[in-house]
Amino acid sequence: MISPENITGLILAGGRAQRMGGIDKGLISFHQKPLIESAINRLKNQVGPILINANRNITKYAGYGYPVVMDETPDFSGPLAGFSVGLKACKTSYLLTSPCDSPLLPLDLAARLAAEMERGPFDLVYASSLESGKTWAQPVFCLMRANLQDSLTAFLTKGDLKIDRWFKELKSSTVIFDDAQAFANVNTPEELKILEAAL
C-alpha cells in the first residue's frame, strides 16, 4: 500500500497566467484567501512533504513554510518544467502534482491515484473527469514514480513541452472522477467569479 508519507505533493504555481493579465494566479484572492492556500489545505492531508513550484513572488510562497522550487528552463515553460524540478527535489518514492488554481481538487485524489498505481505496475497515473457523458483528461493532476527524472529530462531535451506526448512514452493509466467541478480551474477573471459564486 502506498502511504501518504511516501508521496510528495507538488503544487504548480509557476505559470505565466496570460489570460489573467499576467497576475500570479497562486496569489489571487479566492473567498478572501490566496488560491495557493486552498491548494495546500486540500492537499496537505493526502501527502507527506509538500513542494511549491513558483517562478516569482518566491518570498511570499516560502512564507507558507514549504520548499519552493523554481523552473530550470526560462520563459514559464509549462507544467513539465515544474514536474522536472519537483522530481529532482522529491525525496519520497512518488510525486503527486496539482495546479494552484483548482481550489476544489478532490480530497481523495492521492488515495484513488495510488490505488490505481498499485494495480499496475504503472509509471504514472493521472486523473480524468466525467462531464456530460464525456471523459476529459486532467493530466496536471497526476501521481508519478519519482524515478522518472531521466525520462522527463530526455523528453525536455528534445524541446518538447507537451504533457500528453510525454505520457505516451510511459506506462500510464487514468482514474475517472465523477465530479468534474473538482478540477475546475481559474484561467480568466470571469471563471474566478463563476467559481466563487458556485461555493
Curated annotation (Swiss-Prot):
Residue positions binding Mg(2+): D101
InterPro entries the UniProt entry points to: MobA-like_NTP_Trfase, Molybde_CF_guanTrfase, Nucleotide-diphossugar_trans
Catalytic reaction annotation: Mo-molybdopterin + GTP + H(+) = Mo-molybdopterin guanine dinucleotide + diphosphate
Main location: cytoplasm
Binding site for GTP: L12, A13, G14, K25, N53, D71, D101
One Gene Ontology CC term in the entry: cytoplasm
Gene Ontology molecular function terms on file: GTP binding; metal ion binding; molybdenum cofactor guanylyltransferase activity
Alphabetical UniProt keywords: Cytoplasm, GTP-binding, Magnesium, Metal-binding, Molybdenum cofactor biosynthesis, Nucleotide-binding, Transferase
Cofactor field: Mg(2+)
Gene3D superfamilies, per the entry: Spore Coat Polysaccharide Biosynthesis Protein SpsA, Chain A (3.90.550.10)
Pfam families, per database record: NTP_transf_3
Domain of life: Bacteria
Subcellular location: Cytoplasm
GO biological process: bis(molybdopterin guanine dinucleotide)molybdenum biosynthetic process
EC number: 2.7.7.77
Top EC category: transferase
Transmembrane segments: none
Function, as annotated: Transfers a GMP moiety from GTP to Mo-molybdopterin (Mo-MPT) cofactor (Moco or molybdenum cofactor) to form Mo-molybdopterin guanine dinucleotide (Mo-MGD) cofactor.
NCBIfam families in the record: molyb_mobA
Family per similarity comment: Belongs to the MobA family.
Subunit field text: Monomer.
Entry remark concerning the domains of this protein: The N-terminal domain determines nucleotide recognition and specific binding, while the C-terminal domain determines the specific binding to the target protein.
Protein name, UniProt field: Molybdenum cofactor guanylyltransferase
Source species of the chain: Polynucleobacter asymbioticus (strain DSM 18221 / CIP 109841 / QLW-P1DMWA-1) (Polynucleobacter necessarius subsp. asymbioticus)
